[in-house]
């Protein structure tokens, strides 16, 4: 793939360092727009989300060349308003906005927010009822999704999203019709919602098909599934019209009795049981639209950059309905993560036309031949990551995504970790467990091997060992270093004295050498360069062990830390006599 690949969109969350909720808000927005590492096989929006804050009296500039479009979300509280360092920074952002390089969305978290810069127009502000993102989380999501949708789709000022409500008028309790009217009235009673939704009543299926085709770029569909919805011809026509045109659609379930038959083409879309709160429905609808629009642009760019022949893209998981109008030359379908399960693929593969259904991760795995190879991951957070706008949410997500992609290729994971709460060992164990369950593999199948050095492995309880076994994780306890007395071999202690520090350092070195004996390649990113417990920074030592064994090393230097230092050494040719390393700067 071309090295200048750009994502369709990236988002930067800007907050003052004294904003006590700033980091937490960034992580919530990251999980909202990108992914949550604790749920690696759920469908995230996959939009890159970074942050910027005033560290050491300076703010790192936003990289407008990272993506085709860039959004800056300003969290304007009293701290940002009072801190003069933001004055010049916001001026620079406004210049970039005037040049079309990015779009600013400011969140009003202070009564003085409108005065932070006279050129920052009031209509650019997301104004919340209580001026508190945590309290007004539902409202914030709606405003944020709407603003991002408009910018991504290049809507004109005042242009509305066309919302179609498909419902049955023949329920005995009139629940389908009354629910549709309730949604329409709710949207029209809220001036902000009415400003961006053009709510349409569908008179009949034929008219809907014409309407949807004439405004497909800005159309959304809400299906109210009541008792008689599947029985009504026009309802079925409306549902099929939405599917054929890939209109972002959701299903709102209001069943109040027995439905004699469920229309088969009401599946493969988000579904919600109506609980009387329309905000939940609107959030799901806008998220679904943003997901499809972003994935469509991303996959189209991927097909072009990778020069994929005879490939068509779908912004949703494929189903047989999607294959009806596929051109004869198309042999492969590229669709968003996560991959479909085997049972669905078995049905799709009987279509007799399309020979391959792949996600981006599977696309890459097909290009690599690392089945059953043991790939070691060297990763830890670095203080430098903060100045680069990379928080814990992204670091955790990165480690899980690398591991997930490796598992998809058929590789096995190897890591030298400990038992810290929130550490990478726990993350990788959870991933191994979820992947095994998803693949329906034999419980004895091992996906991840974790090496424990002495005396760390003395902290392993039977409960820990049982959990590792359940998670399909192999535990390797490495050799105890020389000089440890018999009475200490079964004990755990912290490296609090020079003699204990010496034993810890020796033990970690033994663990790293033994681990390297049993791997095929290593991926390196982050890494402490101070306050480490070994003879040197752990990632440095692991890289040296890999070089000595002539194993390939893949350095991701864009996250700072020891891996970045290693990249600099390589670039200065200090290691030119060693086996070449692959350097990846992200």
What kind of feature is each model-predicted range?
Residues 31-35, 60, 64, 70-71, ...:
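Acidic/glycine-enriched connector segments
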Residues 22-27, 84-87, 116-118, 175-178, ...:
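A short acidic (Asp/Glu
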Residues 28-64, 81-85, 182-213, 228-233, ...:
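Conserved BB-loop
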Residues 1-53, 200-201, 295-308, 357, ...:
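Extended, compositionally biased accessory segments flanking or bridging domains
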Residues 1-35, 58, 81, 108-186, ...:
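C-terminal interaction surface of TIR/SEFIR-family domains
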Residues 18, 62-113, 170-171, 213-259, ...:
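Conserved beta-strand-loop-alpha-helix hinge of the TIR/SEFIR fold
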Residues 161-224, 305-340, 373-411:
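Conserved small-residue-rich
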């Amino acid at each position: 793939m071309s090295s200048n690949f750009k994502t369709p969109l990236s988002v930067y969350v800007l907050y003052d360092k004294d904003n006590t909720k700033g980091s937490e808000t960034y992580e919530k927005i990251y999980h909202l727009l990108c992914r949550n590492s604790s749920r690696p096989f759920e469908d995230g929006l996959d939009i890159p989300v970074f942050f910027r804050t005033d560290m050491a009296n300076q703010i790192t500039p936003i990289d407008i060349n990272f993506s085709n479009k860039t959004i800056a979300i300003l969290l304007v509280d009293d701290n940002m308003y009072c801190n003069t360092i933001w004055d010049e920074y916001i001026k620079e952002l406004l210049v970039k906005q005037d040049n079309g390089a990015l779009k600013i969305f400011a969140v009003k978290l202070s009564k003085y927010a409108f005065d932070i810069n006279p050129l920052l127009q009031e209509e650019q502000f997301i104004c919340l009822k209580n001026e508190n993102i945590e309290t007004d989380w539902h409202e914030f999501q709606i405003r944020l999704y709407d603003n991002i949708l408009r910018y991504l789709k290049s809507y004109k000022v005042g242009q509305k999203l066309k919302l179609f409500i498909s419902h049955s008028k023949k329920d005995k309790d009139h629940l389908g019709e009354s629910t549709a009217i309730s949604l329409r009235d709710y949207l029209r009673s809220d001036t902000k919602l009415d400003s961006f939704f053009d709510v349409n009543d569908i008179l009949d299926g034929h008219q809907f098909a014409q309407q949807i085709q004439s405004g497909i770029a800005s159309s959304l569909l809400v299906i109210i599934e009541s008792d008689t919805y599947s029985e009504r011809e026009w309802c079925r026509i409306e549902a099929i019209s939405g599917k054929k045109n890939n209109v972002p659609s959701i299903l709102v379930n209001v069943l109040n009795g027995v439905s004699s038959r469920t229309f088969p083409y009401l599946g493969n879309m988000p579904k919600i049981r109506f609980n009387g709160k329309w905000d939940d429905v609107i959030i799901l609808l806008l998220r679904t639209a943003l997901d499809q629009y972003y994935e469509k642009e991303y996959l189209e760019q991927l097909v072009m950059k990778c020069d994929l022949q005879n490939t068509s893209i779908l912004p949703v998981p494929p189903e047989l309905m999607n294959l009806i109008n596929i051109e004869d030359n198309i042999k492969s379908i590229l669709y968003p993560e996560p991959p479909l399960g085997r049972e669905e693929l078995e049905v799709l593969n009987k279509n007799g036309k399309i020979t391959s259904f792949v996600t981006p991760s599977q696309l890459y795995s097909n290009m690599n031949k690392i089945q059953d190879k043991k790939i070691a991951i060297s990763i830890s957070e670095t203080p430098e990551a903060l100045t680069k706008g990379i928080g814990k949410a992204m670091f955790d997500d990165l480690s899980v995504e690398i591991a997930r992609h490796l598992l998809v290729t058929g590789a096995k994971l190897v890591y030298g970790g400990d038992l810290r709460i929130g550490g990478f060992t726990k993350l990788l164990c959870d991933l191994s467990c979820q992947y095994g369950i998803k693949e329906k593999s034999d419980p004895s199948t091992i996906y991840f091997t974790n090496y424990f050095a002495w005396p760390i492995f003395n902290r392993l309880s039977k409960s820990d060992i049982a959990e590792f076994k359940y998670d399909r994780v192999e535990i390797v306890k490495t050799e105890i270093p020389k000089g440890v007395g018999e009475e200490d071999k079964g004990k755990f202690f912290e490296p609090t004295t020079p003699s204990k520090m010496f034993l810890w350092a020796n033990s970690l070195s033994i663990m790293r050498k033994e681990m390297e004996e049993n791997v095929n390649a290593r991926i390196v990113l982050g890494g402490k360069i101070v306050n480490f417990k070994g003879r040197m920074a752990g990632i440095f030592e692991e890289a040296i062990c890999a070089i000595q064994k002539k194993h390939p090393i893949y350095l991701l230097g864009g996250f700072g830390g020891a891996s970045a230092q290693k990249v600099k050494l390589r670039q200065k040719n200090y290691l030119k006599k060693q086996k070449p390393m692959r350097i990846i700067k992200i």
